[in-house]
From Swiss-Prot:
Family: Belongs to the cytochrome P450 family.
Predominant place of localization: membrane
Domain of life: Eukaryota
Record's subcellular location: Membrane
EC number in record: 1.-.-.-
Positions in coiled-coil regions: none
Pathway assignment: Secondary metabolite biosynthesis
Requisite cofactors: heme
Biological role: Cytochrome P450 monooxygenase; part of the gene cluster that mediates the biosynthesis of cordypyrones A and B, 2 pyrones that show modest activities against pathogenic bacteria including methicillin-resistant Staphylococcus aureus (MRSA), Mycobacterium tuberculosis and Bacillus cereus. The HR-PKS milA catalyzes the formation of cordypyrones A via condensation of one acetate with 10 malonate units. Since milA lacks an enoyl reductase domain, the 2 beta-keto processing domains DH and KR of milA collaborate with the trans-enoyl reductase milB to catalyze the different levels of reduction.
Annotated protein name in UniProt: Cytochrome P450 monooxygenase milC
PROSITE patterns per UniProt: CYTOCHROME_P450
Length: 526
């Protein structure tokens, strides 16, 4: 009996301590909210617990969820930051520059990656800069970023001569399409293969020749011909990865053997590059070469293996470089070409700008990085494409401590908002970039000239912002500008169906044109 009484006393004490702690936490939160003048957010009403009806709507929707579900809910609520009535810890959804600045920059230490990010994408991307926590000294994110920073600071990474063979292969394939009478064939798979070859050349020690592998199915292909290895892996992984991201804590519902096999394709390729780099690192140095020559021969992967022996981290970094480098550039180039095809005058203007900088009539040797930066219209084409079609249109963070957002509360949305620890926040550059109050009444139109005299701010986040801004941003912009310039050198015209309004898009791991890239690139001799 005494033992039972002791158990009851211990249990009651533990419960009392728990209740007391929760009461102290609640009191501290109320005080923080009161001291900061916080008021509640607008609340969207879900019909089922945990927002199950909303999650089901997202999973089963066959249209464009960004336009049909996400943008429309902002419009229905009449604000650009809100929460919902989900049980437990309701999320915050926003498309507000001030909120994004706070989360990504000024209150960076109060927020971390969404706790569902790693389990959702870990089977594919592993750890590293895209999915790891940035909290704590010596965090995995900081380690991975420190390994990558000197490589992206190296001017050799931006050497156009490295990527020119891949670009020449792409131009040759476009010539084959024209000769075969298929000038308006969907170019999306060819653009992705181009970027596979570029990224593997620059970062992995050599192209895997994805374009050559895909040449057999480029013109008059046998429908049964197997896709190139990375293309097949991408096509298998991305739809499932997109669902795993969009459904939050229910990511585990979406998996399959093809998905796991696709993930193994990426890790297998990365392991092969690492093994070759390690073998080269362990070779005895050639004393007949001076140190400068030896250093110049090191590729990106060889530099990585000289900085760490953590094979798992090395593999994850390479896989993430493949994903981020290939998909981001593919998304941008695809949308840019479709918009240029819909606006023939813009293509003519681009060619005229290149001619004015003595880059039109010559070959690749006439195109320099410095001159590309001086081509204002070319740079504005890229900016405007990334505004209307950001590759990652929705992202997320999670509050790791009680914090306050600068605005969004109260009837007019001008008051601060208290955010308890554990709150998930989803933010949409896609919606923000299309706001008429930020970009004018023509916000839904592709207009590169809107960037004349306008500098990007926190209302423009195609590459994120703050300490976690995309480390490969400069490379993506540089290589994309070079490819567009080479295409403009080669082809007199770029045409697509003359439709109006934004291009219909499809969301997987990144945003791509739903109908592909049915663009015709031709010249007067074709």
């Amino acid at each position: 009996m005494a033992i039972h009484a002791a158990y009851i006393f211990i249990a009651a004490t533990l419960i009392a301590l728990y209740v007391a702690r929760r009461m102290r936490e609640q009191h501290a939160r109320q005080k923080l909210a009161r001291d900061q003048g916080c008021e509640p957010l607008t609340t969207a009403i879900n019909k089922l617990p945990y927002g199950l009806d909303r999650k089901w709507q997202i999973v089963t929707h066959r249209g464009n969820i960004l336009d049909d579900l996400i943008t429309t809910r902002f419009a229905e609520l009449g604000c650009y930051i809100y929460t919902d009535n989900q049980w437990g810890s309701p999320p915050i959804i926003c498309a507000e520059p001030a909120t994004m600045k706070a989360v990504l920059s000024t209150k960076f230490r109060d927020w971390d990656m969404d706790s569902n990010r790693y389990p959702a994408l870990g089977p594919w991307l592993g750890r590293g800069v895209l999915v790891s926590s940035h909290q704590g000294k010596g965090s995995l994110w900081a380690t991975a970023r420190a390994l990558l920073r000197p490589m992206f600071a190296n001017t050799a990474t931006y050497n156009h001569a490295l990527i020119e063979p891949s670009v020449q292969e792409f131009l040759s394939i476009l010539g084959h399409l024209n000769q075969a009478g298929a000038p308006d064939k969907d170019l999306l798979p060819f653009i992705r293969r181009l970027n596979v070859d570029i990224i593997t050349t620059v970062f992995c020690g050599g192209s895997i020749n994805e374009q050559q592998s895909g040449l057999a199915i480029a013109v008059g292909a046998d429908a049964k011909h197997r896709k190139p290895v990375l293309e097949e892996a991408f096509d298998t992984i991305e739809p499932i990865a997109g669902l795993r991201l969009q459904t939050g804590s229910m990511y585990w519902l979406f998996t399959s053997k093809p998905f796991r096999d696709g993930c193994e394709t990426f890790t297998g390729l990365a392991d092969g590059w690492i093994n070759r780099a390690l073998s080269k690192r362990d070779e005895k140095p050639d004393l007949s070469q001076d140190e400068g020559a030896a250093a110049r021969e090191k590729n990106f992967t060889e530099e990585l293996v000289s900085s760490t022996d953590d094979r798992e981290l090395l593999r994850d970094i390479l896989v993430q470089l493949l994903f981020a480098g290939i998909d981001t550039s593919t998304s941008m180039l695809s949308f840019a070409l479709v918009e240029l095809g819909r606006h023939p005058s813009a293509w003519a203007r681009l060619r005229a700008e290149l001619a004015a900088h003595n880059m039109l009539s010559g070959g690749p040797e006439t195109i320099t990085a410095a001159q590309l930066k001086e081509c204002a219209f070319l740079q504005n084409i890229i900016k405007e494409t990334l505004r209307l079609y950001p590759p990652v249109p929705i992202n997320s963070r999670e509050a790791i401590r009680d914090t306050v957002l600068p605005s969004g509360g109260g009837a007019d949305g001008s008051k601060p908002v208290f955010v308890p620890k554990g709150t998930s926040l989803k933010y949409s550059p896609y919606v923000m970039h299309r706001r008429e109050d930020l970009y004018g009444p023509d916000a839904l139109l592709w207009n590169p000239d809107r960037w004349i005299g306008r500098a990007p701010g926190w209302d423009y986040l195609p590459f994120n912002g703050g300490p976690r801004v995309c480390i490969g941003q400069k490379f993506a912009l540089s290589s994309s500008a070079y490819v567009l310039a080479r295409l403009a050198q080669q082809f007199d015209t770029c045409t697509a169906l003359p439709t109006t309004g934004p291009i219909d898009s499809k969301l997987g791991a990144v945003l791509v044109p739903k109908a592909g890239v049915p663009v015709s690139l031709t010249n007067s001799t074709t």
